[in-house]
Amino acid sequence: MNSIKFPILDRTTKNSVISTTLNDLSNWSRLSSLWPLLYGTSCCFIEFASLIGSRFDFDRYGLVPRSSPRQADLILTAGTVTMKMAPSLVRLYEQMPEPKYVIAMGACTITGGMFSTDSYSTVRGVDKLIPVDVYLPGCPPKPEAVIDAITKLRKKIAREIYKDRIRPQQGNRCFTTNHKFFVVRSPHIGNYDQELLYPPSSTSEISTETFFKYKSPVSSHELVN
């Protein structure tokens, strides 16, 4: 049986030297250890249960879900974002340390979905509140599509420059269109419609004698005549 012999490397061998830049090293460390903050408000968020399971196992990409925005550098938004939830989403994003990334998951998050047609309280796209790096359409997106979006984000991180990423992005943020509300008189103020309580003067009155002289049910036409 032949034993395995390892080659003896000379100390002057050029292949033993790794040359890189500080920017590439920083990008490699960040793309290999993304800590996401899972922000779900609707049905698309259920797909994360499949990702955490053993079949897809998104832990192999170094993703460790965090419950605090101060410990996360990636936020995955899934579901409909309403006007009431918009301030909390912006606050969570602002509490995340730089550099930070956003993946918009699902049609309701990207465009408002079916709720954006007639709803007055739905934000028409999460990019009106926070900047989005990767858009992931679907209703809901499959777990394979979520993994593909994470792979695209990792490639984007590998090509970026750190100084450009941490540059303030307040000027790039745009907010949703202001909704116009008109003040109208409330119908429940105690002023009832008098026409519903009191009949018009043209209606003929029915006397008590005429009403009680009929022992059998009669029509209203007979009572009036």
From Swiss-Prot:
One of its GO terms (molecular function) is NADH dehydrogenase (ubiquinone) activity. Keywords: 4Fe-4S, Chloroplast, Iron, Iron-sulfur, Membrane, Metal-binding, NAD, NADP, Plastid, Plastoquinone, Quinone, Thylakoid, Translocase, Transport. It is found in: Plastid, Chloroplast thylakoid membrane. Binds 1 [4Fe-4S] cluster. [4Fe-4S] cluster binds at residues 43-44, 108, 139. It comes from the Eukaryota. Its EC number is 7.1.1.-. Coiled coil: none annotated. Pfam families: Oxidored_q6. It is an enzyme of class 7 (translocase). It catalyses: a plastoquinone + NADH + (n+1) H(+)(in) = a plastoquinol + NAD(+) + n H(+)(out); a plastoquinone + NADPH + (n+1) H(+)(in) = a plastoquinol + NADP(+) + n H(+)(out). Its main location: plastid. One of its GO terms (cellular component) is chloroplast. It is a peripheral membrane protein. PANTHER family: NADH DEHYDROGENASE (PTHR11995), NADH DEHYDROGENASE [UBIQUINONE] IRON-SULFUR PROTEIN 7, MITOCHONDRIAL (PTHR11995:SF14). Belongs to the complex I 20 kDa subunit family. NDH shuttles electrons from NAD(P)H:plastoquinone, via FMN and iron-sulfur (Fe-S) centers, to quinones in the photosynthetic chain and possibly in a chloroplast respiratory chain. The immediate electron acceptor for the enzyme in this species is believed to be plastoquinone. Couples the redox reaction to proton translocation, and thus conserves the redox energy in a proton gradient. This is NAD(P)H-quinone oxidoreductase subunit K, chloroplastic. It comes from Arabidopsis thaliana (Mouse-ear cress).
